[in-house]
Curated annotation (Swiss-Prot):
Cytoplasmic face residues: 28-43, 111-113, 157-198, 247-261, 308-321
Intracellular or extracellular location(s): Cell inner membrane
Record lineage: Bacteria, Pseudomonadati, Pseudomonadota, Gammaproteobacteria, Enterobacterales
Any Pfam family hit: TerC
InterPro entries: Integral_membrane_TerC, Integral_membrane_TerC_rswitch
Residue spans crossing the bilayer: 7-27, 44-64, 90-110, 114-134, 136-156, 199-219, 226-246, 262-282, 287-307
Top-level division of the source organism's lineage: Bacteria
Membrane topology of the entry: Multi-pass membrane protein
Entry's Gene Ontology cellular component terms: plasma membrane
Described function: Has been proposed to be a redox modulator.
Protein name from the UniProt record: Putative membrane-bound redox modulator Alx
Family: Belongs to the TerC family.
Periplasmic side stretches: 1-6, 65-89, 135, 220-225, 283-286
């Protein structure tokens, strides 16, 4: 697997992520079982975005010193594009978490605890998936066409899909988990497991954590191939992906109260997936530059938010009338 990642870059990335996670977990422990406020969520979202941009700037500077601008510019642009793609697709993941917490009636104070472990699990699972994907691409380059076709199909499916939280409990996976886990009927404070009559029982909070992890894996199956359309370098794919999901918990609490105001977002994300799928399928006939890909993705997101704002304005105006 060809990569610009050197031991220094890998080590620096690991140190930054470890320190930030330790600070985040330390603050989580001090606050106890309290919901993250909108102000805290906004502050942490800003921290993670700023840290990601600073890392990319340091990454660019390092490559300029060691490889020159000819290498540094496209690699830093690839990181930024991958980060933007993952960050935008992660919003849909956040809305699924909101549905899960709503269906299982998880209090806001406990949602934070679930998401702490959910994000930690996502880091491990996505790291495994990215290195596996990089190895597969290095051995079988035709697999990019499979990724492209899959993203094209997923984009169309996303645009046509209708989410309904009322049917979550009837999903085969949920029924299977409930049937194979010794589980209590109610949430017991912040515990994932409790003992009753000498037996260990999982609480509904554990079921929610499992579903949060599985939902992230499902979304990673979309987002990781999308970043491989930009670059196959495992260092850039992994760092851009993980920096994007590290801020997911803060993003959740930032958007949780206004989820219904983003009704048009899934269509914008669907267009992004279709574009990336087509980009991967035509790569042998026409190579779309990274700068163009970044511009297209950013442009789609801007147009989506403009349309969304217009739709919300129309709805609010109709309510007043």
């Amino acid at each position: 697997m060809n990569t610009v990642g050197t031991p220094l870059l890998w080590g620096g990335f690991a140190v930054v992520v470890t320190i930030m996670l330790a600070i985040d977990l330390l603050l989580q422990g001090r606050r106890g079982a309290h919901a993250m406020t909108m102000k805290q969520a906004a502050a942490w979202s800003l921290v993670w975005v700023t840290l990601s941009l600073l890392f990319n700037a340091a990454f660019w500077w390092y490559l300029v010193q060691t490889e020159g601008r000819a290498v540094a510019d496209p690699q830093a642009l690839a990181f930024l594009t991958g980060y933007l793609i993952e960050k935008s697709l992660a919003v849909d993941n956040v809305f699924v978490w909101l549905m899960l917490f709503s269906y299982f009636s998880v209090p806001a104070a406990l949602q934070r605890r679930v998401l702490v472990y959910g994000v930690l699990g996502a880091i491990v699972l996505r790291t495994i998936m990215i290195f596996t994907g990089s190895w597969l691409i290095s051995q079988f380059d035709w697999i990019l066409y499979i990724f492209g076709a899959f993203l094209l199909f997923t984009g169309v499916k996303m645009a046509l899909a209708h989410e309904d939280e009322s049917g979550i409990g009837d999903k085969p996976l949920v029924r299977w988990l409930r049937g194979h886990l010794r589980m209590t009927d109610t949430i017991d404070n912040e515990h994932f497991f409790v003992r009753k009559n000498g037996l260990l029982y999982a609480t509904p909070l554990m079921l929610v954590l499992i579903l949060v992890e599985l939902s992230d894996v499902i979304f990673a199956v979309d987002s990781i191939p999308a970043i491989f359309a930009v670059t196959t370098d495992p260092f850039i794919v992994l760092t851009s992906n993980l920096f994007a999901i590290l801020g997911l918990r803060a993003m959740y609490f930032l958007l949780a109260g206004v989820a219904e105001r983003f009704s048009m977002l899934k269509y914008g994300l669907a267009v992004i997936l279709v574009f990336i799928g087509i980009k991967m399928l035509i790569v042998d006939f026409y190579h779309i530059p990274i700068a163009v890909s970044l511009g297209v993705v950013f442009g789609i997101l801007v147009m989506t938010f403009i349309i969304n704002a217009w739709v919300n304005y129309r709805h609010d105006k109709q309510r007043v009338e």
